[in-house]
Swiss-Prot record:
NCBIfam families: rplD_bact. InterPro entries: Ribosomal_uL4, Ribosomal_uL4-like, Ribosomal_uL4_dom_sf. This is Large ribosomal subunit protein uL4. One of the primary rRNA binding proteins, this protein initially binds near the 5'-end of the 23S rRNA. It is important during the early stages of 50S assembly. It makes multiple contacts with different domains of the 23S rRNA in the assembled 50S subunit and ribosome. The keyword rRNA-binding applies. Disulfide bonds: none annotated. One of its GO terms (cellular component) is ribosome. Belongs to the universal ribosomal protein uL4 family. One of its GO terms (biological process) is translation. Residues 63-93 are annotated as: Disordered. It holds the Pfam family Ribosomal_L4.
Amino acid sequence: MDLTVKTLEGKDAGKVSLSDAIFGLEPREDIIARVVRWQLAKRQQGTHKSKGRAEVSRTGAKMYKQKGTGRARHHSARAPQFRGGGKAHGPVVRSHAHDLPKKIRALGLRHALSAKLKAEDIIVIDDLVANEAKTKALAGAFASLGLTNALIIGGAEIEGNFKLAAQNIPNVDVLPVQGINVYDILRRGKLVLSKAAVEALEERFK
């Protein structure tokens, strides 16, 4: 499929052909959802922790004698049923990450790109270069292109002035092409690709 290439000033700068093997798939929500769950599980901190009965600071002595009181049998006050006792089966520090095959991860990215193209939410920009590191000027250019909520993917490296100017614009994320991922594609309204990013993606998936 051919898309018109734009400049940051909003002018046409030719056309680019997008590979159907990357951008032309019928999006599968189940695969995209699997990749998003994998990403979010991997970034989850897992620092949750509660103290069990072996860790709470209370006496370990038997509360009262076993027989003759008419009351229920108990050992120490650390037991979970008592106020101040340890938590039974409480959270522990752990990693929430789980495995996902590389083929599924790659397929999920292609389906996310295809979903964006199907929704007509992909814009290809000729070159992501700013003459000066001025947020106001770049924000105006983005507004004229309708980029109020966007993920911008550049080449292997983001040009310095562009990176500095863009980093303070709300709801706009800028990543090099090696940082492209399913979750960030979906959480932003528009996906902006530089020509270098398109070439890198086609090289990656060929």
